[in-house]
Amino acid sequence: MAKEFSRTRRIAQQLQQELAVILQRDMKDPRIGFVTVNDVDVSRDLSYAKVFVTFYEEDLTLVEQKIAALTAAAPYVRTLVAGRMKLRVMPELRFIYDSSLVEGMRMSNLVSQVITNDKAKQKQAGREDDTPSVDEQEKDTD
């Protein structure tokens, strides 16, 4: 019977917390800037860890430069993490840009834009039909 939280998942969570603190406080590289550690995926044998990160910038060339800077600093970051976590094997860190946050924001903006356009078209048409809008239906249920 498998445990609810496997050892690799617990290590990944602790590694994520330690990496977030180290990248925010201990790294002084101006090329990296503000970085957020979204997730860490550790291999079963603890030899590798995929570190999913996001940056404040959305420009793809800047993101690639920041990933390259993190990759170059990975051995140093690994030694800092090894000093904080007591593991027999410290995973090799592989930094990967996580575009899910940017994609989520883009999708949210698209949905908002479609809703705005739909409302404008309804006003322009003069609301020829008498069906209540979504907003009116929500007010009726409150």
From Swiss-Prot:
Under the heading Pfam families, the entry gives: RBFA
InterPro entries the UniProt entry points to: KH_dom-like_a/b (IPR015946), RbfA (IPR000238), RbfA_dom_sf (IPR023799), Ribosome-bd_factorA_CS (IPR020053)
The record's Gene Ontology cellular component field reads: cytosol
Judging by the UniProt lineage, the source's domain of life is Bacteria
Which region ranges are annotated with the description Disordered? 118-142
Which is an annotated GO molecular function term of this record? Answer: ribosomal small subunit binding
Write out the entry's keywords from A to Z: Cytoplasm, Ribosome biogenesis
The record's section on PANTHER family has: RIBOSOME-BINDING FACTOR A, CHLOROPLASTIC-RELATED (PTHR33515:SF1)
Q: How does it assemble?
A: Monomer. Binds 30S ribosomal subunits, but not 50S ribosomal subunits or 70S ribosomes.
Q: What is this protein called?
A: Ribosome-binding factor A
